Amino acid sequence: MAVPKKKTSKSKRNQRHAVWKAKAATAAQRALSIGKSVLSGRAQGFVYPVAEADDSES
């Protein structure tokens, strides 16, 4: 079984953690921005099913 030979330094651990947190913050910011544009009606790249199509089938 593969095991690390030496302990990872605190600085390397903190750097990896900071990269992970930065990626998560970027993804959260993008999701919030997309949500705001959808709610405000400014979204251009989304296609939504029309509710009237569901009513006509019944």
Curated annotation (Swiss-Prot):
**Highest taxon listed in the record's lineage:** Bacteria
Name this polypeptide is given: Large ribosomal subunit protein bL32
Write out the entry's keywords from A to Z.
Ribonucleoprotein, Ribosomal protein
Q: What organism is recorded for this protein? A: Synechococcus sp. (strain WH7803)
Quote the InterPro entries the UniProt record gives.
Ribosomal_bL32, Ribosomal_bL32_plant/cyanobact, Ribosomal_zn-bd
Q: Which GO terms describe its cellular component?
A: large ribosomal subunit
Family designation:
Belongs to the bacterial ribosomal protein bL32 family.
Q: Which Pfam families match?
A: Ribosomal_L32p (PF01783)
Gene name as annotated: rpmF
GO BP, one example?
translation
